[in-house]
Regions:
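Helix-to-loop junction immediately C-terminal to a conserved catalytic motif
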Residues: 66
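Conserved ABC ATPase "signature" region
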Residues: 81-82, 129-148, 199
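Short coil-to-helix segment of the ABC ATPase nucleotide-binding domain corresponding to the Q-loop/switch region
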Residues: 111-119
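Conserved ABC ATPase signature
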Residues: 152-156, 160
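Conserved catalytic motifs of ABC-family nucleotide-binding domains
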Residues: 173
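Catalytic Walker B motif of ABC-type/P-loop ATPase nucleotide-binding domains
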Residues: 177-180
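Helix N-cap at the start of a conserved alpha-helix in ABC-type nucleotide-binding domains
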Residues: 188-190
Length: 214
């Protein structure tokens, strides 16, 4: 597994996202060791791309970083908090500052695009519906899907589903964004557009981003 960090041209601006520090991370499934002594650091406001082939453990690493898997050993620092050592309640609070775009988009097929984007806002805030609707339109506009609030996911192309998933990941104005195979299954031109969108999000919001890809 390899990784690299990309520096932004506007690095003189103060980043809003925290740094991520992973120290000697191990994840076992029974007797099988999936991750062995993984260590890396993502500076605040920077982007790291984690590269690995199928079965290399990169998706397990991502799930562990967002708290969906518990590490067998090691530390995961998000700013000044060791995410791996927090209680479930503390982890849930910190997770609200994260956005996650899953492979394939993971949109709920029975909900409209707007309802999908609004879901985190309904679950984690007490905002009025009118305010949520404004925020949904704003997020969709930012990813190039203005006017698609009432579309169903089945009506979208693969690239549009990815954009809608990014809008949902951005709904809570996260400090950290995680992407799992954001351009998987897309043709090169559409994939390049998704990559450009991720770079745009990073430049505009100066947040910390981790991308897993192959």
């Amino acid at each position: 597994m390899a990784n690299k960090t990309n520096s932004a041209d506007d690095s003189y601006e103060t980043p809003s996202g925290p740094s991520i520090k992973v120290r000697n991370l191990r994840v076992n499934y029974g007797e099988r060791e999936i991750l062995h002594s993984i260590s890396f650091e993502v500076p605040a406001g920077e982007t790291m791309v984690i590269l690995g082939g199928s079965g290399s453990g990169k998706s397990t690493l991502l799930r562990t970083l967002v708290g969906l898997e518990k590490p067998t050993a090691g530390e995961i620092w998000m700013g000044d908090k060791n995410f791996a050592a927090l209680t479930d309640a503390e982890r849930d609070t910190l997770r609200k500052k994260m956005g996650m775009s899953f492979q394939g988009g993971a949109l709920f097929g029975a909900m409209t695009v707007g309802e999908n984007v609004a879901l985190p806002l309904h679950e984690h805030t007490n905002l009025e519906q009118s305010t949520i609707e404004i925020m949904v339109r704003l997020k969709l506009d930012q990813v190039g899907l203005s006017g698609f609030e009432n579309y169903m996911p089945a009506q979208l192309s693969g690239g549009m589903k990815k954009r809608a998933a990014i809008a949902r990941a951005m709904a809570m104005d996260p400090e950290i964004l995680f992407f799992d195979e954001p351009s998987a299954g897309l043709d090169p031109i559409i994939a390049a557009g998704i990559d450009e969108l991720i770079l745009k999000v990073k430049k505009v919001y100066r947040i910390t981003i981790v991308v897993v890809t192959h």
